[in-house]
């Protein structure tokens, strides 16, 4: 039942980041209801980086106590925690607690931290677990990981998150009975942004996220125990006695590997290359491995931290529709890149480098528009809206393809390589977030605009 295994691998991957991705797309609905206000994204960035204690623990265990940590119990624990945390979030996200003379959304922040631990730790446990299955299922897993961002975005659009209408401030205040003696609203006809009620509440959205985590848990159970999946598993000794020394991968000669598992380097005498390093199969030299991991860290820094932190600044000046189109279509581009990699797995390091440069170019354009906010280039034209949406889509498409291909390459290098793959993913994301946090939240280098009152010269 190859199809069943593909479906389960996709559903399993979908649970990797669905919780945090869901919280991010729900922010426009949450922020007006809590005392932290628009500081919440900055707090979330810090919480996610603090949650890297999870992957740090797993990575150190693999480094200093190889073979002592089985990913399966860890995965059961973190996915179960994700189910409980998202369920509690549905009922406690609006609750506040007096703390240090002010009210804070302590339950929301604590639950967000726990979900960050779940999702960050998945990067160094889900990927190594996929070594139990054939190499063709790794790309399917990445498709599911991409869908973990797509599904919450689509549901949020159906919910109506962030839909804004402009009304005359004086009229709105009179209608609400809020225009008093000390009111600063005059008769100047100033417009006021009003967010319309969502089609369903944040509570329903968080219950949906909890259901998604339950689906992930069920998929993981079936991947471990379904008879049809068991027939396709690799040799179990890899996860028993063989895991400690990780010799099973080294014992496989390149000449006996299936064609799709061979690393594809354009060198004509690659099959005669001697072992060049002690890492994995040793097929790649030290500089080549360094290049792979540096690119992996760079790509994840851009896609997971640097550009997402300024997405609103780059898109909202062009209008709310541009922002939602960019967010949704970029989320679609991720699984599309995984599908492309499934049928066109070009593992050339030269191609990886070129695609990284191209994707970085699109990211540079996005960053430039964010820097010029609230009046970026072509802000009053349809071409400006089109360009920013296309830039986001191509940025995510190219760099997502790079991430998937690097994952496939490192999968061929063995279990340890995938563990370090997950660690580098988190390292790159952490460095990107730590570099952007002071720029956005402390120094205020990026300026926001009012969707109804900001005026830009044409």
From Swiss-Prot:
Belongs to the riboflavin transporter family. Signal peptide: none annotated. The keyword Glycoprotein applies. It is found in: Cell membrane. One of its GO terms (cellular component) is plasma membrane. Residues 249-274 are annotated as: Disordered. The chain crosses the membrane at residues 11-31, 38-58, 73-93, 97-117, 146-166, 204-224, 279-299, 325-345, 349-369, 388-408, 417-437. PANTHER family: SOLUTE CARRIER FAMILY 52, SOLUTE CARRIER FAMILY 52, RIBOFLAVIN TRANSPORTER, MEMBER 3-B. This is Riboflavin transporter 2. One of its GO terms (molecular function) is riboflavin transmembrane transporter activity. It catalyses: riboflavin(in) = riboflavin(out). It is a multi-pass membrane protein. Disulfide bonds: none annotated. Plasma membrane transporter mediating the uptake by cells of the water soluble vitamin B2/riboflavin that plays a key role in biochemical oxidation-reduction reactions of the carbohydrate, lipid, and amino acid metabolism. InterPro entries: Riboflavin_transptr. Its main location: membrane. Glycans are attached at residues 168, 176, 182, 199. Keywords: Cell membrane, Glycoprotein, Membrane, Transmembrane, Transmembrane helix, Transport.
């Amino acid at each position: 039942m190859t199809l069943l295994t593909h479906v389960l691998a996709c559903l399993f991957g979908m649970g990797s980041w669905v919780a945090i991705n869901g919280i991010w797309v729900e922010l426009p609905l949450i922020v007006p209801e809590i005392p932290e206000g628009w500081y919440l994204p900055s707090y979330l960035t810090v919480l996610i980086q603090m949650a890297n204690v999870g992957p740090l623990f797993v990575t150190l265990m693999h480094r200093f106590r190889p073979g002592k940590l089985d990913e399966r119990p860890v995965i059961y624990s973190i996915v179960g925690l994700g189910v409980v945390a998202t369920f509690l979030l549905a009922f406690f996200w609006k609750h506040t607690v007096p703390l240090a003379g002010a009210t804070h959304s302590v339950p929301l922040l604590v639950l967000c931290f726990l979900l960050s631990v779940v999702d960050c730790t998945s990067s160094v446990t889900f990927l190594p677990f996929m070594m139990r299955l054939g190499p063709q299922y790794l790309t399917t897993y990445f498709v599911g990981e991409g869908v973990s961002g797509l599904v919450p975005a689509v549901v949020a659009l159906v919910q109506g998150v962030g839909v804004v209408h402009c009304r005359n401030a004086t009229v709105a205040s009179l209608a609400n009975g809020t225009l008093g003696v000390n009111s600063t609203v005059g008769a100047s006809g100033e417009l006021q942004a009003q967010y319309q009620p969502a089609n369903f509440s944040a509570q329903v959205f968080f219950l949906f996220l909890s259901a998604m985590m339950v689906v992930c848990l069920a998929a993981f159970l079936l991947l471990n125990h379904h008879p049809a999946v068991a027939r396709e598993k690799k040799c179990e000794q890899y996860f028993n006695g063989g895991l400690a020394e990780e010799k099973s991968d080294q014992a496989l000669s390149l000449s006996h590997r299936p064609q799709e598992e061979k690393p594809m380097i354009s060198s004509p005498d690659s099959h005669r290359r001697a072992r060049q390093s002690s890492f994995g199969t040793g097929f790649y030299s030290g500089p080549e491995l360094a290049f792979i991991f540096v690119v992996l860290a760079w790509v994840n820094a851009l896609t997971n931290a640097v550009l997402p932190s300024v997405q609103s600044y780059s898109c909202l000046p062009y209008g709310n529709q541009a922002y939602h189109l960019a967010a949704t279509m970029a989320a679609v581009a991720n699984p599309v890149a995984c599908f492309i990699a499934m049928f066109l797995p070009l593992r050339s390091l030269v191609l990886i480098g070129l695609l990284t440069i191209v994707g970085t170019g699109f990211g540079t354009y996005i960053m430039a528009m964010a820097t010029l906010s609230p009046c970026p280039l072509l802000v009053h034209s349809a071409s400006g809206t089109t360009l920013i949406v296309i830039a986001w889509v191509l940025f995510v498409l190219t760099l997502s393809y790079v991430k998937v291909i690097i994952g496939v390459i490192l999968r061929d290098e063995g279990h340890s390589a995938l563990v370090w793959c997950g660690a580098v993913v988190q390292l790159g994301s952490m460095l990107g977030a730590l570099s952007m946090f002071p720029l956005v939240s402390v120094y205020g280098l990026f300026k926001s605009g009012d969707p109804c009152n900001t005026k830009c010269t044409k």
